[in-house]
UniProtKB/Swiss-Prot annotation:
Phenotype of null mutants: Morpholino-mediated knock-down causes severe trunk shortening, disruption of somatic muscle formation and impairs the expression of the mesodermal marker t/xBRA, similar to the effects of inhibition of fgf signaling.
Lumenal side stretches: 57-59
First-listed, main subcellular location of the protein, grouped into a coarse class: membrane
Cytoplasmic-side positions: 1-35, 81-876
Key words, A-Z: Calcium, Cell membrane, Endocytosis, Endoplasmic reticulum, Lipid transport, Lipid-binding, Membrane, Metal-binding, Repeat, Transmembrane, Transmembrane helix, Transport
GO BP annotations, alphabetical order: endocytosis; endoplasmic reticulum-plasma membrane tethering; lipid transport
Membrane disposition: Peripheral membrane protein; Multi-pass membrane protein
Region (Disordered): 1-21, 614-714
Keyword Electron transport: no
Name of the featured protein: Extended synaptotagmin-2-B
Domain annotation SMP-LTD: ranges: 123-302
SMART domains: C2
Gene Ontology cellular-component terms listed: cytoplasmic side of plasma membrane; endoplasmic reticulum membrane; endoplasmic reticulum-plasma membrane contact site; organelle membrane contact site
Length: 876
């Protein structure tokens, strides 16, 4: 579901980045509108010079009256010289590249190869023994597949249509190359004790030959090769204390697999440009209807009573995605061959398993605001991840602007995540998301609270955010009428009865029943069961419900063969609210149908409620800092164009950056260093947007510089320390200085084990010393000792003429938690100085040895600055 927001509160600001201050969004948009198009002057001058050099010789020839042959001779000589020189240079460059960068080129080549998952992820096992087993079993697997095609699929196709009565498979050969399992992952955390969950990274590249023929029309077609790559989940549950130990086996894909098919015969036209992608998409949709979540294949190994719950899976939760806004996106639209830079027309594609949502397109804006809301079902976790991609809409092909991959396990723990995320695979850009984890509850105690929170008015029973989730399991039907004349015509129109009587030959044939379900504006359809009055579907359907007190479930059984209704029923959802455990499991008699016609269904209603975060009391103040760990990088898949979801009213929360500045300013106005401990919760909340929004990720394909030692003299060497002590004595001048004579600095320090990085957030400084009569121009420089190379240095921006600067900037250091105990954080506050009149100098220093236990939890603290950093008293 999608919605557009109403009015916003307060002027939101952009989050701080590495070395960049936060900027008000209104100011950024105003500046962006003023500079709609920026011209590359250097590029324009280069283009003009190049054109002049090409035209000027022609002018000289005409001016002196020379023959045009001179120009041709000069051109031939120039081409010969450039070709000769180019060959020599290319040989020389290849030799130098081979000698100097052999190791780098090999590493780059290995990184570009699509290696198996077990190479990149330590929790995925290679399991080569499994591939050897599959290879040994492959001939017998091929025999089973051939038997399945000939004895099951072939008769089904023949019976589907009279024109296909001569359909047959002439050749079925799966090839000699077996299915390969590139990695196996077994989940041990967040898993029920009575189940085993395995993820198999499967890959099949085979010379498969499947030929078919319809003799009646002399039509031949087939497939000559198939490639299939994807992640298949296998669930063994429930585990029982009797043979065969496992009650059932469930198999499904977490997301759509990658599929490539080469056709032959008549179907070879599907390989034509434009049709090849369409044919693969149609086949993938067919696979999704059977094998991609929420669909699955369940193989019972014990009695049906023990696995009845597997046929009626309740989703683990519902993820409400507030797709709010983005900032500093890359520009993709250019003019005059790139000399004039334009804007982008951004839109977003959100994927969760088999569910796809697309936002509206914002024209010519690098800071778009969508303010839309989507609701997606989470059927399995761990394993399912939220994928978000941004694109620039173009007439030919949409350009990629960045992507995100978010782990839903962390979102479930936090319940509500409202952060700015740095886009992956992009040179710039941030995305503002608010994620809410809604837990399905089988009680109505929170229903009134939920209805009030989503503003479920009586006149809007079918629109808006969802208050409940309806899960329906369609089992079977009994005693359906074989033809329209057997239907109980009470309540039916006379014209409909006469139309049924005129059906002629169709009256004597068996029905092809299917079921239509509708809740509000949402309609879902079951599969068609051919030539039967006792159909068995065993399908599950889910509906989002806005107001269960006022909405109804409408069910209608229809006959595809006779094109008529076979019965209907209307079930008020309030009836389910009054039932035990909010569940109905019974046979429902059909109206306007046969005398004994009924549907067997199991219907459950679950109230969607946001629970409190799942964390211990010790983690309550550090939960905000933990949020960036849910971000991971990922290569973007090819975008699809799904239909946009319906709009729902939504009002975005104010940007937390404003609260940060206000709280820190209040802290600066206070003269007591212990003012902040009175409200530790606010202090950690103020740093949430900073720690969550400024974490950057360097894509592997972007150019990076080799680390080189810093040749610039470090100002916090003994000479600078002596100057600082002298300045401190001058300030003292016979008076007694306070507890922190050089001032204090506020830092948030946390280590992310998932990303293997140390995050340091520089919030602010207070009560710094004045470097001159006009004050100081302070900035903060950070090293993680013993690394003092230029590449290991981190710097904030410079604040002019202030002794209480506010930075709110986040920096990252790549270091493991085990190695962190041997490292020291070197923080120096320095005076930036001017170009001619001021000199740089040291304002204070801090040397901090980080405890690994504290770093894993994360903490925020004020630290005293000293002359050499060795005496570091701290206040909370």
């Amino acid at each position: 579901m999608a919605s557009e927001s109403g009015a916003e509160k307060g002027p939101p600001t952009t989050p701080a980045e590495n070395g960049q201050p936060g900027v008000p969004i209104a100011a950024a948009v105003a500046a962006d509108e003023q500079g709609m198009i920026s011209v590359d002057i250097a590029g324009l001058f280069y283009q003009f010079s190049k054109t002049f050099i090409l035209i000027f010789p022609v002018y000289v020839l005409g001016y002196f009256g020379l023959s045009f042959s001179w120009l041709l001779i000069a051109l031939v000589l120039l081409l010969w010289w450039r070709r000769n020189k180019g060959n020599k240079n290319s040989r020389l460059y290849r030799a130098l590249a081979f000698l100097e960068t052999e190791e780098k080129s090999v590493k780059h080549h290995i990184a570009s190869i699509d290696l198996p998952a077990w190479v990149h992820f330590p929790d995925i096992e290679r399991a080569e023994w499994l591939n050897k087993t599959v290879k040994h079993m492959w001939p017998y697997i091929c025999q089973f597949i051939e038997k399945l095609f000939r004895e099951t699929i072939e008769p089904a196709v023949r019976g589907a249509n009279a024109h296909l009565s001569t359909f047959s498979f002439t050749k079925i050969d799966m090839g000699s190359q077996p299915l390969r399992i590139n990695g196996v992952k077994v989940y041990t955390e967040n898993v029920d004790k009575r189940q085993i969950i395995l993820d198999l990274q499967i890959s099949f590249v085979g010379e498969t030959e499947i030929d078919l023929e319809v003799k009646r029309y002399f039509c031949r077609a087939g497939v000559k090769s198939i490639q299939l790559h994807g992640t298949m989940r296998v669930i063994l549950e429930p585990l029982i204390g009797d043979v065969p130990i496992v009650g059932a086996l469930s198999i499904f894909f977490l997301r759509k697999p990658l599929l490539e098919i080469n056709w032959t015969g008549l179907t070879n036209m599907l390989d034509m440009p434009g049709l090849n992608g369409l044919s693969d998409t149609i086949i993938l949709d067919i696979i999704s209807n059977y094998l991609v979540l929420p669909n699955r294949i369940t193989v019972p190994l014990v009695s049906d009573v023990q696995i009845a719950q597997l046929r009626f899976p309740i989703p683990k939760g519902v993820l409400r995605i507030h797709f709010l806004e983005a900032q500093d996106l890359m520009w993709k639209d250019t003019y005059m061959k790139g000399l004039v830079k334009g804007k982008s027309d951004p839109y977003g594609v959100v994927r969760l398993g088999n569910q796809v949502f697309q936002s509206k397109v914002i024209k010519e804006n690098l800071n778009p605001k969508w303010n839309e809301v989507y609701e997606a079902l989470v059927h399995e976790h761990p394993g399912q991840e939220l994928e978000i991609e941004l694109f620039d809409e173009d007439t030919d092909k949409d350009d990629f602007l960045g992507s995100l991959l978010i782990d839903l396990v962390e979102v479930e723990k936090e319940r509500v995540v409202d952060e700015w995320f740095t886009l992956d695979e992009a040179t710039s850009g941030k995305l503002h998301l608010k994620l809410e984890w809604l837990t399905p509850k089988s009680t109505t105690e929170n229903l009134d609270q939920v209805l009030k929170s989503i503003k479920a008015d009586k006149d809007q029973a079918n629109d808006g955010l969802s208050a409940a989730l309806l899960i329906l399991y369609l089992d079977s039907a009994r005693s359906l009428p074989n033809n329209p004349l057997e239907i109980n015509h009470d309540g039916m129109k006379k014209a409909a009865v006469e139309k049924a009587k005129k059906a002629g030959k169709k009256i004597g044939s068996s029905p092809n029943p299917y079921v239509l379900f509708s809740v509000g504006h949402t309609v879902q359809e079951s599969k068609v069961k051919y030539k039967t009055a006792e159909p068995v579907w065993e399908q599950t359907f889910t509906f989002f419900v806005h107001n269960p007190k006022r909405q109804d479930l409408e069910v209608e059984v229809k006959d595809e063969n006779h094109q008529n209704s076979m019965g209907n029923i209307k079930i008020p959802l309030s009836q389910i609210l009054a039932s035990e455990d909010l569940t109905l499991n019974q046979r429902f008699h059909l109206n306007n149908s046969g005398p004994n016609s009924s549907l067997k269904m199991k219907i459950a209603l679950r109230i969607l409620h946001v629970e409190k975060p799942v964390r211990s009391p010790d983690e309550q103040h550090t939960s905000q800092v933990k949020r960036p760990s849910i971000f991971k990088g990922k290569q973007p898949p090819t975008p699809q164009m799904p239909a946009p979801s319906p709009a729902v009213a939504h009002k975005p929360p104010p940007t937390p950056k404003l609260e940060t500045n206000k709280k820190l300013e209040n802290g600066n106005k206070s003269s007591t260093p212990s003012a902040s401990p009175k409200r530790p919760t606010e202090l950690h909340k103020s740093s949430s947007s900073l720690s969550g929004s400024s974490f950057t990720y360097s894509p592997p394909h972007l150019p990076t510089k080799e680390p080189t030692p810093s040749i610039a003299s470090d100002i916090s060497l003994p000479v600078a320390t002596q100057e600082l002590r002298e300045r401190l004595r001058q300030l003292q001048n016979g008076t007694t200085l306070g507890q922190s004579p050089l001032g204090q600095i506020q830092l948030t320090i946390r280590h992310s084990s998932q990303r293997n990085k140390l995050m340091v957030v520089v919030h602010s400084c207070r009560n710094l010393i004045a470097f001159s009569e006009e004050g100081s121009d302070p900035y903060v420089r950070i090293y993680l000792l013993p690394d003092k190379r230029r590449s290991g240095r981190r710097k904030t921006h410079v604040h002019k003429r202030t002794l209480n600067p506010i930075y709110d900037q986040t920096f990252e250091f790549s270091v493991s938690l085990a190695d962190l105990q041997r490292r020291t954080l070197d923080v120096a506050v320095k005076n930036g100085g001017g170009f001619l009149f001021r000199e740089k100098g040291l304002l204070g220093k801090l040397l901090l040895e980080i405890n690994t236990e504290d770093a894993a939890k994360g903490w925020t603290q004020w630290f005293d600055l000293t002359e050499d950093g060795t005496r570091a008293a701290a206040s909370s």
